[in-house]
């Protein structure tokens, strides 16, 4: 994933010295105490790792692949990438999957979450041209994983859209719903006999606002509070359309599960004043709930607070309709319940308070939400300036999901720590251990968490940060001819947890 979070949040996150919070002790230690009766993960709990196609595959113009939005963006705007790099070669996983497989086997993971490149398999976005070489490649990957008792978990869209679709406005045009429907049908038909876990979209909240609101990701549209909301609306409908397709056409004989990966922090207040819990709930609904509430909530629509605020603000701005229209009865029926599991990408947390007056452009998500987000300067920070070690947040967001969404089954689809790429990565081990402890605590408290995926298997291209921030359990020698993968100390630690099913 990863660097994307900062692009949304850097505009309105402040630092604060919150040294006497009722939630956290002072100090920067990255740890969490064990709670509950069980000290081991259940036998049916699955451990894995994640990657994404554009970030690791390389081979950007080989074997019939079409251009993606990220190919075009990095080639036309190298100055927007911190080290002027791109994903043209990346880890060369398209040609070096055997090296990735060696790492997966060393880790003894139960599953591998990877994404299929839409422009690689369908260069023109629809099914008129199907790239057989790409199909053969992904068939090879899936078959080799299964031969080694590693379950494939496939993400359909991890931010690399066929460039062809940007001509129509990308996710601002509802035609993308139909295109994604065809793409999903193709994937289910081609790979669904072996792939039983599907993630339609990865972190739509995180790509919609930077790409269509703040103009810092392709296609660099600056229309906050309008185009980014269209993106999120069309993504939600595309997801639900694909889900209903699977249930109607494939589910009975393929027996798979379909869900979405939603990113979120957990939010806290540093006060016990009346109304503080409302602020926490508001922050959660304006981020996580934007997608989770329509799918897993009772209403089958966006959170009421979000609908009410944006409608009111739109009227104040002189508009005849809301910038975020509630889902129609037709779409509400399709969207509600369109998830067999909930994918959660969690990295860090924030403190939240109401911003008076509201901040941000008019219109914008920042202005509509009226939230001011803060971090505690005593928290341990990663290489990424948005990433702090707050394991309690993972435990608490899992409990929040349990209570809000009828204890839906949760797959933790991403969770990770960045540094400069050092092999002796003690901080990553601390982060990993404390967050796995949070998962175990949540399981002990009745949360239905069944999968955990660390981000990432190997160091990779981190979007606008290039290769300046590394999340991998394996170091990637980007400049070498063979793109060697070298195990960091954290890889050994993670393997020990997987083998023993307990935290050491």
Stretches found by the model and what they are:
Residues 50-52, 115-119:
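Acidic/polar N-terminal loop/beta-strand segments that form early-domain functional surfaces
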Residues 44-46, 94, 111:
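A common structural microfeature
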Residues 3-21:
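Cleavable N-terminal signal peptides of Sec/SRP-targeted secreted and luminal proteins
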Residues 18-81, 105-106, 124-126, 132-504:
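Active-site region of glycoside hydrolase catalytic domains
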Residues 82-96:
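Active-site mouth loops of central-metabolism enzymes
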Residues 1-3, 140:
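Ordered, helix-dominated protein-protein interaction surfaces in large eukaryotic regulatory proteins
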Residues 110-117, 151-155:
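Short, well-structured secondary-structure segments
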């Amino acid at each position: 994933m990863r660097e994307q979070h900062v692009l949304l949040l850097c505009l309105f996150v402040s630092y604060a010295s919150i040294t006497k919070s009722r939630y956290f002790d002072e100090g920067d230690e990255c740890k969490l105490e064990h709670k509950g009766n069980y000290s081991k993960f259940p036998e049916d709990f699955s451990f894995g790792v994640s990657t994404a196609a554009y970030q690791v595959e390389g081979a950007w113009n080989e074997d019939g692949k079409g251009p993606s939005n990220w190919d075009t963006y990095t080639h036309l705007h190298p100055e927007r990438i911190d080290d002027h790099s791109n994903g043209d070669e990346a880890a060369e996983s398209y040609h070096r999957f055997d090296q990735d497989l060696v790492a997966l086997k060393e880790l003894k993971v139960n599953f591998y979450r990877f994404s299929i490149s839409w422009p690689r398999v369908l260069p023109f976005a629809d099914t008129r041209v199907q790239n057989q070489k790409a199909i053969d490649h992904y068939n090879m990957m899936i078959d080799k994983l299964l031969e080694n008792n590693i379950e494939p978990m496939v993400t359909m869209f991890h931010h690399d859209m066929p460039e062809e679709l940007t001509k129509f406005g990308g996710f601002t045009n509802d035609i993308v719903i139909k295109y994604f429907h065809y793409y999903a049908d193709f994937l289910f038909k081609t790979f669904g006999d072996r792939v039983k876990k599907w993630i339609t979209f990865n972190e739509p909240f995180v790509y919609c606002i930077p790409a269509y609101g703040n103009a810092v990701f392709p296609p660099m549209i600056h229309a906050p509070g309008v185009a980014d909301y269209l993106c999120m609306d069309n993504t939600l409908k595309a997801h639900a359309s694909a889900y209903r397709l699977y249930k109607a056409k494939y589910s009975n004989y393929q027996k798979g599960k379909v869900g979405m990966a939603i990113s979120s922090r957990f939010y806290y207040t540093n006060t016990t004043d009346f109304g503080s819990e409302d602020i926490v709930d508001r922050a959660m609904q304006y981020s996580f709930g934007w997608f989770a509430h329509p799918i897993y909530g009772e209403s089958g629509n966006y959170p009421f607070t979000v609908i009410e605020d944006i409608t009111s603000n739109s009227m104040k701005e002189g508009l005849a309709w809301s910038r975020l229209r509630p889902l129609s009865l037709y779409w509400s029926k399709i969207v509600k319940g369109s998830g067999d599991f909930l994918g959660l990408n969690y990295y860090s947390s924030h403190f939240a308070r109401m911003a008076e007056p509201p901040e941000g452009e008019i219109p914008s998500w920042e202005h509509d939400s009226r939230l001011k987000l803060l971090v505690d300067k005593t928290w341990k920070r990663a290489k990424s300036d948005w990433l702090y070690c707050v394991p309690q947040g993972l435990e608490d967001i899992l409990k929040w999901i349990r209570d809000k969404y009828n204890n839906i089954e949760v797959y933790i689809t991403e969770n990770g720590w960045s540094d400069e790429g050092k092999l002796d990565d003690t901080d990553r081990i601390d982060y990993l251990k404390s967050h796995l402890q949070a998962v175990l605590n949540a399981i002990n408290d009745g949360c239905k968490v069944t999968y955990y995926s660390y981000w990432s298997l190997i160091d990779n291209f981190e979007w606008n940060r290039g290769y300046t921030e590394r999340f991998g359990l394996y170091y990637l020698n980007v400049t070498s001819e063979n793109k060697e993968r070298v195990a960091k100390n954290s890889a050994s630690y993670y393997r020990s947890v997987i083998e023993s099913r307990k935290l050491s």
